[in-house]
Amino acid sequence: MVLSQRQREELNKAIADYLASNGFMEALESFKKETDMPGDIDKKYAGLLEKKWTSVIRLQKKVMDLEGRLAEAEKEYISGTPSREKRSPTEWIPRPPERSALLGHRAPITRVLFHPVYSVVVSASEDASIKVWDYETGDFERTIKGHTDSVQDIAFDHTGQFLASCSADMTIKLWDFKSYECLRTMHGHDHNVSSVCFLPSGDHVVSCSRDKSIKMWEVATGYCVRTFTGHRDWVRMVRVNSDGSLLASCSNDQTVRVWVVGTKECKLELREHDHVVECVAWAPAHAQLCGAAGDSNRRPGAGGAQGTGPFLVSGSRDKTIKVWDVSTGLALFTLVGHDNWVRGVKFHPGGKYLLSASDDKTLRVWELAHQRCCKTLDAHSHFCTSLDFHRTAPYVVTGSVDQTVKVWECR
């Protein structure tokens, strides 16, 4: 492309201003002489070269983003993937590129979580803060501060009125999510508190810790009312089932345990992982798991009997995801495909898919009925540590050691 005479003159004056403002006086005099530039440079050319340069970079970034979206759209068009309008919401899965990348944390993201009512996503980080973002606009809303060390996990009660957080500072905090006020701080663990969740009733919080214990706390008073012991090493995560009768926990001792909330009894110890078990998730009642496992996947002596659930999923540093039938204590099947530690697992609200996040930097979508990975997204530039799937809106969120939170649209 050839510049017009006027464009050439404007470019020369912008270059001259750049040379003058950076003190390259000899080069400026030589340049003015070579280009026959008269007198002083008009002030309107001040900083023009830098502005043009940065605008070109911004445009290049936008073009690359659009090219990526176009390539993905062409790929899906060729493969015959239907648009969202033609698909049932139970079929929607996250697709690249991300809708937004949320920047603000100064250390790795440990947990991401959608609010059950508001259009916000909450992130916890090793920078000891919790941040609130509008996932539709990508806008940062506020920072919640109070912990003095890495925030390890966060959880909402079913109304979204209360937020619980736990930290390496050995405390659990309860926050009013309207006023962002810390209502109470719960002390009792002797080491890093790694996970927290609400019982469905909202009147109790459950936590687990590197001190090998699981504790239940009364929300109204902040008192510890129950302690579950049995794990032989750091308890990484604890999650409660939909009716609040069972707890699932996983540990550095390479086991998953299922506990009866009312009696503190350890109902099951599941032992098939070969490394630290990082995460667990309960399957929704409508998850497509009952017919997913054939007899070949069962242990000898199972007699081919089909369990009725409930079902539980665990992700491990052995790079695998296991699906368990809690009624029989058997692993139904193992999902293999990640190239590094599995850090997060989450069921699709429709029950057809399972999503997983891994230190291989990917977000994977697994079709449960066929036990296969049907989509892999290169989600982050570093380890992918956490994910969540919105219960009603078509969004997935991921967090990473790269300090970003990414929102993905589903279709």
UniProtKB/Swiss-Prot annotation:
State whether keyword Flavoprotein applies: no
What keywords appear on the UniProt entry? Cell cycle, Cell division, Coiled coil, Cytoplasm, Cytoskeleton, Microtubule, Mitosis, Repeat, Transport, WD repeat
Q: Which GO terms describe its molecular function?
A: dynein complex binding; microtubule plus-end binding
- Tell me the compartments it is located in: Cytoplasm, Cytoskeleton; Cytoplasm, Cytoskeleton, Microtubule organizing center, Centrosome
Query: In its UniProt record, which GO terms are filed under biological process?
Result: brain morphogenesis; cell division; establishment of mitotic spindle orientation; germ cell development; microtubule organizing center organization; microtubule sliding; nuclear migration; retrograde axonal transport
Which Gene3D superfamilies does UniProt cross-reference here?
1.20.960.30, YVTN repeat-like/Quinoprotein amine dehydrogenase (2.130.10.10)
Residue ranges of the LisH domain? 7-39
Which residue intervals make up region (Disordered)?
A: 77-96
The annotated regions of Basic and acidic residues compositional bias extend over 77-89
- Coiled coil ranges: 54-80
Naming one, the record's GO cellular component terms include:
kinetochore
CDD domains found in the cross-reference section: WD40
Kinase among the record's keywords?
A: no
Provide the residue intervals of the WD repeats. 104-145, 146-187, 188-227, 230-269, 272-334, 337-376, 379-411
What is the role of this chain?
Positively regulates the activity of the minus-end directed microtubule motor protein dynein. May enhance dynein-mediated microtubule sliding by targeting dynein to the microtubule plus end. Required for several dynein- and microtubule-dependent processes.
The family annotation for this protein states: Belongs to the WD repeat LIS1/nudF family.
In the record's own words, the domains note is: Dimerization mediated by the LisH domain may be required to activate dynein.
What is the official name of this protein in its record?
Lissencephaly-1 homolog
Q: Which organism is it from?
A: Ixodes scapularis (Black-legged tick)
